UniProtKB/Swiss-Prot annotation:
UniProt motif 'HIGH' region: location: 104-114
Protein name: Glutamate--tRNA ligase
Gene Ontology terms describing biological process: amide biosynthetic process; glutamyl-tRNA aminoacylation
Source species of the chain: Methanosphaera stadtmanae (strain ATCC 43021 / DSM 3091 / JCM 11832 / MCB-3)
NCBIfam families recorded: gltX_arch, PRK04156.1
A molecular function (GO) term: glutamate-tRNA ligase activity
Highest rank taxon of the organism: Archaea
Gene3D superfamilies per the UniProt record, alphabetical: 2.40.240.100, HUPs, Ribosomal Protein L25, Chain P
Enzyme class: ligase
Amino acid sequence: MDIEETIYKYALTNAIEHGNKCQVGSVIGMVMSKNPEMRKDPKTVSQLAGKLVAKVNNLTPEEQQKEVESLGGLEQHTKKEEKPKGLPELKNTEDKKVTLRFAPNPSGPLHIGHARAAILNKLYQEKYNGKLILRIEDTDPKRVEPDAYDAIPQDIKWLGIEPDEIYTQSDRLEIYYEYAQKAIEIGAAYMCKCDGGEFKKLKDNCQPCPCRSHTIEENMELWNNFENMEEGEAVLRIKTDINHKNPAIRDWVAMRIVNQEHPRLGNKYKIYPMMNFSVTVDDHLMGMTHVLRGKDHLANSEKQTYLYKHFGWDVPEFIHYGRLKMDDVELSTSKAREGIENKTYTGWDDPRLGTIRAIARRGIKKEVLYDLIEEIGTKQADATISWKKIYGLNRNIIEENTNRYFFIPNAVKVDVENLPSSKTNMTVERELHYNKPEKGFRNLTFNGSVYIPEDDYKHAQDKNIPLRLMDLINIKIEEDKVIYDSETLEDAQAQHARIIQWAPVETSISATVVMPDNTHVTGYIECDASNLEVDDMVQLERFGFARVDKINDNEITFYYTHN
């Protein structure tokens, strides 16, 4: 096999393994690593790789497959050794039912950051045959989005998570009141009426406020009168170490008054627990053995440990992981809501957002998130998820079973002139999936009038080179006329023609593809797409993968997934 044939085979291999598109750099790397003798002439290798990559990328998937088979099949090459999968072991799992919880605040639908917590808990539940609890933490009326009560269970269901038990904290206020009173009775908590600014000065100087020395009886009297006070007039504090090195840990607030109507409770209550109090009480009563949370909760874990010890309760194992970011995507719920309110975003499933429903609408599979989250694990180092990684994993999942169709973006209608009589009424049969003939075929009729992509039309016009309509004929553009040029693929390749998709004018269906930046690409799709159903995944040849979002009588709307 000569040098050109060798590089050609590697280019075909790279294309077939990566969505039918190869990259010059990848091909050169494969060639050099497997054929050390070629390192002596890198210039020639580089020039040939550039030419052959362009040739391969101009072939249809079927043509790539046929070409590589004619050369003896895919080139074998060394792949990077895969890292072993699996989460680290949890401590202290012996002789107990491992119990975990996913506890989101209902400030909006879930995003990828929430998915990390949900999936980690799910994976550990499965690993230890444990129990998983969903707990909606809605004890701050100012941070509750009513729609989230329905959205969170829906998002959890899409992730494939079925909690063993579900709780909503606003149903449990009387329980928190009971334990607040118990904390007072054992001397672990006190009612504080100090001005917030004054208390901070004392706290920062490791000095107790005057309220800390109240007797239990004095604290109970204030507690019993708490409901008659105004917001900010008093709080219930948990005693910690007033000399603690972190001022945030010192005598933290457990209960406060919130003068805001609660979406579920109305104005029935005005005394609400702070997160650290309600979470500790619930985690104990619900039998939590392990708590997985972000490292931004390190101080909260320490605060909660004081309350565990006050009550003589077992402290669960706390596992803290790093922050999760996503390239070019808004994960802040508050910023997303602001964008929705000012019409920057179309809703919680706007493709520019990192919400679960936005990702799902684009056709990203939940298995991708599981793979990513398991790989990142519980490391305390911050992690960034790239779209490139998501797309690669998703492509591996969907490619095998995704049918192919011709979509013509920004379509130009052309009438091919000078057709031989044998080409005036033809039917082209194409496989729905070139690797799975058992899936069947689609038929495209040709009578001279077709839609082709505007970009390809302009390219042929500017470069004065023909275009090949896939599996059909070659055409050329002379001024504003489209003329029959020749018939064979070899003729097209000899003239460096682009091989393009097309659709019959008479039978095509209007189609719109919503892109990741929320722009809309309009065009036409072949008539066999009328058999599609909502949520079907397709590969629009030479355009990308997409999910069927909506089907009307004469139009299909897709959401673009990736290339």
